[in-house]
A protein has these predicted regions:
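Edge strands and adjacent loops of beta-rich recognition modules
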Residues: 13-36
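Juxtacatalytic substrate-recognition/specificity segment
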Residues: 33-171
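An active-site-proximal "capping" alpha-helix that borders the catalytic cofactor pocket
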Residues: 68, 173-185
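Surface-exposed helix-capping loop/turn segments at secondary-structure junctions
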Residues: 70-88, 153-155, 188-194, 260-264, ...
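C-terminal recognition in membrane/secretory proteostasis and scaffolding
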Residues: 182-183, 192-440
Length: 440
């Protein structure tokens, strides 16, 4: 791994897997270093503007790394840390800064990230913007993968076949559980407060609830279909699939809160026990079930069958209430009420129509351009979706005028009376802290 100032020299990979796992980038970078758990880390930025507060970014990245080191290996100097060294001798963050982009790929001792320039922290501006929190969540997610997927990994990935797609039913665990911890560990690292964390969790919950595909595809099926569905999305994806990232994250939440409510253990303990049981290597769902049984004091086969392999909604609201967090139901935004997803530039363009919604019942289709509405004999040009309520007033029955393949269609649309969305609020701060601020 590159830590020298200029990096010139000869590098040798032990095998093809190591070669494929080591990203290489040449150019002029900003570079900063820190230690976490006694291990040297390097942060490299390419494409950042001069306004970027690199000191803050470096310090916050260090806090994330230290929190995740503690999660997996305990605090430095503690008895629980004996013989539990991090599985790498150094680590590299490669941040490629672009005008508009987001994503990352984990490696055994590095990660390659794409971040938007506007999401970077700015000199003289100490605000914790939503964009910066998203960036920190990405850093947290990919760093957590160093343990959970690059070492602890699906048994199907014991040996890689670079000439074919590799399938597993466990992405709900490896991506979903990582997604659960990426934001939670920001909270435990002190980078966000309870309200900010619950806002992020709330977004995940609503994403799942607003995906009709959750009623037809399980998290295990979504994992297996990643190559053919998740990475080949179309206008009907939301109706036929569920994200193993978001659904898996909520499965992790339910497992964690169930274990804590029963007073035996937590998902934190399960993750560390799996690390030890599988010797930081390949694992199966049976390994996960065995550790749950060992730490939880009972078999969780019914829960796993329903949550992982079933399609019913998860008991999120009930479990949150047991941990001092309540769900408030609030009116949803207009697009959600109608069951559509749109883009608005010069017109209202329909991107997706969700199964069972008012728009589908009216006959609105993906790729339609919603050009106008007729209400009580009056016609109105529609350029922004939110203007619909202005024109409709108290009327629930209107006519939607859409352009489809250059033809104008008049479709009878009934506006739904009420559709709600969730908002999470702490009811019992002391009880919530046992989960949100947990050290175990």
């Amino acid at each position: 791994m590159l830590f020298r100032s200029r990096g010139f020299g000869t590098y040798l990979a032990a095998d093809d897997d190591e070669l494929a796992d080591c990203p290489v980038e040449l150019g002029a970078f900003w570079s900063g270093e820190f230690k976490a758990g006694g291990v040297p880390h390097r942060l490299v930025l390419a494409g950042a503007a001069e306004s970027c507060d690199t000191t803050r970014l470096l310090a916050d990245t260090q806090k994330i790394c230290e929190a995740e080191m503690r999660f997996w290996h305990g605090r430095p100097g503690s008895a629980s840390r004996a013989g539990k060294r991090p599985p790498f001798k150094n680590y590299l963050f490669m941040l490629n800064v672009v005008d508009d982009g987001y994503g990352g790929l984990e490696h055994r001792n590095s990660t390659a990230l794409i971040v938007s320039r506007r999401d970077l922290p700015r000199l003289g501006d100490g605000r914790q913007t939503d964009g910066y929190i998203t960036l920190l969540g990405l850093v947290s997610h990919e760093y957590f993968h160093t343990w959970n997927v690059k070492r602890l990994r699906p048994a199907e990935f014991t040996h890689f076949d670079y000439g074919a797609e590799n399938y597993t039913q466990l992405l709900w665990f490896f991506e979903g559980f990582t997604s659960y911890y990426d934001d939670l560990l920001l909270r435990r690292a002190g980078l966000i407060d309870d309200a900010a964390y619950l806002k992020l969790l709330n977004k995940t919950i609503n994403q799942v609830l607003q995906t009709p595909g959750r009623e037809v595809q399980s998290a295990a099926q979504a994992s297996f279909d990643a190559w053919v569905k998740y990475y080949r999305q179309d206008e009907n994806t939301a109706n036929t699939t569920v994200s193993y990232y978001t659904k898996g994250s909520l499965i992790a939440l339910c497992v964690d809160l169930t274990l804590r409510a029963e007073g035996n253990s937590s998902l934190d303990d399960v993750m560390r026990s799996l690390w030890a049981r599988c010797k930081a290597g390949p694992m199966t769902e049976a390994d996960f079930a065995a550790v749950l049984r060992e730490l939880g004091g009972r078999a969780y086969s019914r829960e796993l069958a329903a949550w992982v392999h079933g399609i019913r909604d998860l008991p999120v609201e009930e479990l949150l209430d047991k941990h001092g967090v309540v769900v408030l139901k609030e009116p949803a935004q207009l697009a959600q009420r109608l069951g559509i997803r749109v883009t608005e530039t010069s017109a209202v363009q329909i991107k997706q129509v969700l199964r069972g919604g008012a728009a589908e019942l009216a006959g609105i289709a993906a790729n339609d351009e919603w050009v106008g509405v007729e209400v009580a004999g009056n016609g109105w040009r529609l350029t922004k979706l939110d203007d619909l309520t202005l024109y409709a007033g108290d009327h629930r029955k209107i006519t939607a005028v859409v352009a489809r393949d250059r033809r104008l269609l008049r479709l009878d649309l009934t506006l739904p009376a009420a559709v709600t969305t969730w908002r999470l609020v702490v009811r019992d701060p002391a009880l919530a802290q046992l989960w949100l601020g947990a050290a175990h």
